[in-house]
Amino acid sequence: MSLIQREQYLDFLRRHKDQDVIKVVSGVRRCGKSTLFELFKQELLDSGVKPNQIISINFEDLEYEALQEYHALHKYIVERLIPDASVYVFLDEVQHVPQFEKVVGSLFIKPNVDIYITGSNAYFMSSDIATLLTGRYVQIEMLPLSFKEFHSAYSQQNLSDMEIYNLYIEHSSFPRLVRVEDDESIDEYLESILNTVVLKDIVTRLKITDVPLLLDIIKYLLANIGSLINPTKIANTLTSYGRKTDNKTVEKYLQGLKDGLLIYEVNRFDVKGKALLQRNAKYYVVDSAFRKFLLSRTDSDRGHILENIVYLELVRRGYHVYVGHQQNGEIDFVAKKPHRLEYYQVSYTVMEDATLRRELSPLEQLDDNYPKYLLTMDVLHKTDNHNGIEQKNVLDWLLE
């Protein structure tokens, strides 16, 4: 099967090609970063770049283990630079190289060197490294396949949008699993990702000794997607089930899951006071198939699964996303960009009038003129407008 073109991320690399900035792509393991590099390198070759103008190293490959020492890596690359010719340097999973920023910083000041790096966690671009490279890099976070990208893989099959959506949430959005049908293969792959992210990355980095507790916290978060919770509530619930822990431990493990880009924390935003609220947050998962895999749940709570999908799509579209807090209601998502603000309510269906009124109420309380949307699975013959609130079919919105 041909590779799915990840246009959003390819366009990011194209726009910054040959510009005097380091291109950084972060994202959870197996989301497609290495494939993105392969696609982009092929574009370079097709445009006339010669093979010896491309230096590409994947630090997951044992062949390059000796280059995980930063002096050796620097020497290897410098020896392959070509006088008076552009050289494109791709460093994949660069977090395996302690002090890689010294190599990148040194290469950056050399003429005609265009640098691209990837990493599979949030801390590989720690505050110290980010400070060292301030003003010298641009970064994009890569996610597994969007519904639109996933949908494109099934364009030749006679499937409805709804049938493809069901495959999307149950069979995973990780690129390798597209068109994989048997549950056993899907489960094995998801387990391998969890083992890598949880055991190889989080447990090792945080020196966690109670791995079962970490897995229990993951399961709790997956069972409570889209619910307002906090570390104390998680600790108390697990303790009541006989899994004794405390909020400090939960906070530490939560931070590890966020750094591993497996779980996303969405804080509350006081819509009237225009301030972030510290207590309680919602949590979403990078791929909803983990919920089915770890909890053996399929059709239950489809509303919160849909909410999870919408959250990730807003992140893909470049928004900073918050939960909107009001005195008399909650807005699922406040999506912010510079000089731009949008409000979103997400509901699987609002066919019952009481449900429609409940979902519209928080948006109706807003006294500004920013766009307001209600996203549902309901089939609409046109975009419904409820006194300035646009109701859209969520699958149509995801395919925009």
Predicted feature locations:
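Pre-Walker A adenine-sensing motif
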Residues: 4-18
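Hydrophobic anchor at the beta1->P-loop junction of P-loop NTPases
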Residues: 25
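Conserved lysine of the Walker
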Residues: 33
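Hydrophobic positions on the alpha1 helix immediately C-terminal to the Walker A/P-loop
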Residues: 36, 40
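Short glycine-rich substrate-engagement loop in P-loop NTPases that contacts/grips substrate
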Residues: 56-85
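Interdomain motor-coupling "hinge/lid" segment immediately C-terminal to the ATP-binding subdomain
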Residues: 120-122, 127-228, 261-264
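Accessory nucleic acid-recognition modules appended to NTPase machines
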Residues: 183-341
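Domain-level recognition of nuclease-like catalytic cores that cleave nucleotide substrates
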Residues: 379-400
